[in-house]
Regions:
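Mid/C-terminal beta-alpha module of Rossmann-like enzyme folds, strongest
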Residues: 9, 15, 212-276, 289-321
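NAD(P)H-binding glycine-rich loop region in Rossmannoid oxidoreductase-like domains
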Residues: 51, 55, 60-113, 117-119, ...
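SDR active-site strand-loop-helix element
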Residues: 20, 46, 91-92, 126-132, ...
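A short helix->loop->beta-strand "cap" motif at the edges of active sites that frequently abuts
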Residues: 121-125, 158
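Residues forming the Rossmann-fold NAD(P)(H) cofactor-binding site
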Residues: 28, 108, 147
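Conserved glycine-rich Rossmann-like NAD(P)H-binding loop of the short-chain dehydrogenase/reductase
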Residues: 39-51
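N-terminal Rossmann NAD(P)H-binding glycine-rich loop of SDR-like oxidoreductase domains
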Residues: 9-40
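Oxidoreductase cofactor-interface core, primarily capturing Rossmann-like NAD(P)-dependent enzymes
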Residues: 13, 136-247
Length: 321
């Protein structure tokens, strides 16, 4: 493990938070949110490579965290990274397996390591980001792996808050750019004509949920299904985004089985296909949960779908970030 790099003005603080997978979009948003808290919450960001560390080193000085490079599967390295921290936020995870990145390593192994590290370091709580539908008994390899990771945390010594979320969308992020591209398409092929239900949550709301997990006392050993306030078919979601531009794409219905078959073939003939059958199954799964229990438990507000689209996809959002 590389030793943490201390940003200017860094201070030791009992409320320090270890964030794993901190170089991703959610991690960077969380770092900024905590840095701008009153008082600021110091963050130690754990990443797995020097290249990932460079992403965080490029952040503005006033929000730049301590940075350390670790092996997410190494409990000893994570325990050292967690020294002097009170909480950990575990954001490590993948949707698509590759030849060098497997579900077992990204989910179960990394979660087992952070659980062991948290016990060694005496952390107060781990906040874990999971996926709606995660279940050890799932027939989907990704959701089953996530479900096993959840169980590791529930069985661990350190209390955990598990947040299961659907699609997360924020200004300027990859998801927002994909939705914008689809909304502006003249013709858009969608599995089953876009009948699968989606329930996107605003990235800022998720960040507030994670922050609540670092601030509230009544969130130990909980699994919360957290989603946006509205569930609707994918087709309607894209059409609503398109209306912000006075557009309406022509939806071309493609049989779901055919899409999954093609994805399966791609896995057989390419070492790193753009999408896999397993990842597609997660993307096409129906997201339709009641977010109110989680919202109330966390004490947060949820941004309406129309406001999400305005901020992330609408004409005023296209130049952001």
């Amino acid at each position: 493990m590389t030793q943490p790099s201390n940003p200017p003005g860094a201070q030791n603080d009992a409320a320090r938070v270890l964030v794993t997978g901190a170089n991703g979009q959610i991690g960077r948003r969380l770092i900024e949110r905590l840095a701008r808290s009153n008082p600021p919450v110091p963050v130690r960001a754990a990443v797995r490579s020097a290249r990932a560390a460079e992403t965080l080193e490029a952040l503005p000085e006033e929000i730049r965290p301590e940075i350390c490079v670790v092996d997410y599967r190494n409990a000893g390295e994570l325990a050292e990274a967690a020294r002097d921290c009170r909480y950990a936020v575990h954001l490590v995870g993948i949707l698509k397996e590759t030849a060098t990145s497997r579900y077992e390593d990204a989910h179960e192994a990394s979660t087992r390591a952070i659980a062991d590290a948290a016990a060694t370091a005496g952390l107060r709580r781990i906040v874990y980001l999971s996926i709606l539908g995660s279940d050890p008994k799932s027939s989907n390899a990704c959701l089953a792996s996530k479900g096993r990771a959840e169980q590791i945390l529930l069985d661990a010594k350190t209390p955990a808050l598990i947040l299961r979320v659907p699609m997360v969308i924020g200004p300027g992020d990859v998801t927002a750019n994909i939705v914008l591209r689809e909304a502006l398409s003249r013709a858009l092929p969608l599995a089953a004509g876009g009948r699968s239900r989606t329930q996107p949550i605003y990235a800022g709301d998720l960040i507030e949920a994670i922050a609540a997990g670092l601030e509230r006392d009544d969130l130990d050993d909980l699994i919360l299904d957290l989603a946006g306030p509205e569930s609707l078919p994918q087709r309607e979601f894209i059409e609503r985004a398109a209306r912000l531009y006075g557009r309406r794409p022509h939806i071309v219905s493609i049989p779901t089985g055919l899409i999954l078959f093609i994805a399966g073939l791609a896995e057989r003939f390419f070492t790193n296909p753009a999408i896999t059958k397993t990842a597609l199954e997660v993307i096409l799964a129906d997201d339709d949960v009641d977010p109110e229990p989680a919202r109330q438990k966390l004490g947060i507000d949820l941004t309406s779908l129309d406001e999400i689209l305005r901020r992330c996809v609408g004409p005023q959002a296209t130049q952001r970030e």
